[in-house]
């Protein structure tokens, strides 16, 4: 198991190197340091001197990939790609490229807690609600409850998340005045600002997850061990909850585990629409401001979380099914 973990971590490092280079290439294929300087300096008339000063202050005055004027290894090391990559792998995110030059590491720590307040309850409720709803439909399979439940799932997954947001804000905030339409507050006051985003996000994902889990549970109900359990006279509820659910844990773990990075990174759409200052909103602001320092930091953290979550999923498989071995 230790050898497996070491091997996966080494693979993960290679993936991070590839992600870092690909992010760098894509960003500077669309933008140039001069474009970034003009956007951040602002104003109608930006002189070349101001641009060069901005680039020198933020380390963009060097070649991006290859320094032809340098000698030896400095042809590679005295480039923007190398200097930014080394600091990134040392978990030194530096400061943003904007005029405020905020400490990216501090912003991530502060905003991650806010994103967790939104995403962690949503993650837990999503797994419970989707599993329970899917089991309910399987329990009443081939009945009207199952039919209309599937119709409801298809309807929910066919509707855009933006529709839920617009209708929810109009109905619950403007009409009923139950919760604030947007914003955020610290402490227990955060609950009233997070209730609607959590509820609407749950609805937006429930149809997709419940329909997937229902298909997995139905596949399990046709297997020999289920027929044997029924032949022994076990009630259908025990067959479903004790046997079917246990043996369907692996696909559930896969589906739920793939969502784990979003728990930490936040939801881009919901945080932006509801004015929640989490990591999702942080990324949107960085993209709009062409802030490469923030963009590459968030992409790097996202890649680390995805690698870590899939390693955790593999270990969770061995817990859910003792027959699984990590080689």
Model regions and ranges:
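Hydrophobic alpha-helical transmembrane segments of membrane transport/permease proteins
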Residues: 16-76, 176-193
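Membrane-water interface segments at the C-terminal ends of transmembrane alpha-helices
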Residues: 25-33, 151-180, 200-202
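Residue-level recognition of pore/gate-forming positions within transmembrane alpha-helices
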Residues: 12, 44-45, 127, 154, ...
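Hydrophobic alpha-helical membrane-insertion segments
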Residues: 16-21, 154-165, 255-260
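An internal, D/E-rich "acidic patch" concept
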Residues: 63-131
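Hydrophobic aliphatic residues
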Residues: 26, 30, 40, 44, ...
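N-terminal signal-anchor/signal peptide hydrophobic helix marking the start
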Residues: 6-16
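Alpha-helical transmembrane segments of integral membrane proteins
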Residues: 2-3, 112-145, 161, 186-327
């Amino acid at each position: 198991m230790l050898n497996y973990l070491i091997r996966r971590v080494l693979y993960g490092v290679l993936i991070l190197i590839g992600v870092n280079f690909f992010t760098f290439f894509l960003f500077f294929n669309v933008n140039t340091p001069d474009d970034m300087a003009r956007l951040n300096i602002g104003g109608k008339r930006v002189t070349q001197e101001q641009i060069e000063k901005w680039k020198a202050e933020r380390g963009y005055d060097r070649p991006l990939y290859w320094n032809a004027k340098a000698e030896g290894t400095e042809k590679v090391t005295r480039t923007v790609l190398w200097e930014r990559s080394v600091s990134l792998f040392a978990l030194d995110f530096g400061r943003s490229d904007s005029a405020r030059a905020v400490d990216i590491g501090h912003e991530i720590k502060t905003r991650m807690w806010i994103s967790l307040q939104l995403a962690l309850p949503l993650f837990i409720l999503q797994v419970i609600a989707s599993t329970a709803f899917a089991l309910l439909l399987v329990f009443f399979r081939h009945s009207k409850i199952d039919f209309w439940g599937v119709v409801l799932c298809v309807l929910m997954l066919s509707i855009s998340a933006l529709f839920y947001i617009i209708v929810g804000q109009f109905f619950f905030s403007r009409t009923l005045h139950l919760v604030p339409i947007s914003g955020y507050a610290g402490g227990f006051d955060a609950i009233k600002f997070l209730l609607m985003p959590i509820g609407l996000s749950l609805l937006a994902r429930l149809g997709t997850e419940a329909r997937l889990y229902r298909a997995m549970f139905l596949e399990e109900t046709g297997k020999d061990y289920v027929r044997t359990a029924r032949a022994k006279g076990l009630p259908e509820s025990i067959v479903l909850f004790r046997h079917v659910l246990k043996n369907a844990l692996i696909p559930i773990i896969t589906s739920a585990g793939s969502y784990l990075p979003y728990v930490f990174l936040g939801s881009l759409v919901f945080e932006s629409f509801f004015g929640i200052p989490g990591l999702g909103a942080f990324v949107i602001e960085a993209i709009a401001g062409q802030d490469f320092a923030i963009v590459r930091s968030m992409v790097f953290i996202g890649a680390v979380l995805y690698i870590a979550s899939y390693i955790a999923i593999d270990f969770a498989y061995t817990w859910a099914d003792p027959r699984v071995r990590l080689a």
